[in-house]
């Protein structure tokens, strides 16, 4: 029986047991693809993207040899969400004012008026 593509979806993180081939997701049992901030809610800089990628790669290495089931994918997604919130709270990431919907899903931005 052929395995199905698994995915874990949070508001800002989507993880698939797949690789991108010709701009399409193709199931791959040994690869994960990260779709970060699909709604463009944040403004990303190179440093914050590198931190996310390092964390993602580290979480994958921690799970080497384990089955990547729905539960493990959700745990990875939750940890990435936590890092996004940390980066936002520490000013290393900011909301995108041109986002389709401005809902401050990770809390209100820290400004001098709020502090």
Swiss-Prot record:
It is found in: Cellular thylakoid membrane. Its EC number is 7.1.1.-. Its main location: membrane. One of its GO terms (molecular function) is quinone binding. The keyword Secreted does not apply. It is a peripheral membrane protein. Pfam families: NdhM. InterPro entries: NdhM (IPR018922). It catalyses: a plastoquinone + NADH + (n+1) H(+)(in) = a plastoquinol + NAD(+) + n H(+)(out); a plastoquinone + NADPH + (n+1) H(+)(in) = a plastoquinol + NADP(+) + n H(+)(out). One of its GO terms (cellular component) is plasma membrane-derived thylakoid membrane. Keywords: Membrane, NAD, NADP, Plastoquinone, Quinone, Thylakoid, Translocase, Transport. Belongs to the complex I NdhM subunit family. NDH-1 shuttles electrons from an unknown electron donor, via FMN and iron-sulfur (Fe-S) centers, to quinones in the respiratory and/or the photosynthetic chain. The immediate electron acceptor for the enzyme in this species is believed to be plastoquinone. Couples the redox reaction to proton translocation, and thus conserves the redox energy in a proton gradient. Cyanobacterial NDH-1 also plays a role in inorganic carbon-concentration. NDH-1 can be composed of about 15 different subunits; different subcomplexes with different compositions have been identified which probably have different functions. PANTHER family: NAD(P)H-QUINONE OXIDOREDUCTASE SUBUNIT M, CHLOROPLASTIC. HAMAP family: NDH1_NDH1M. This is NAD(P)H-quinone oxidoreductase subunit M.
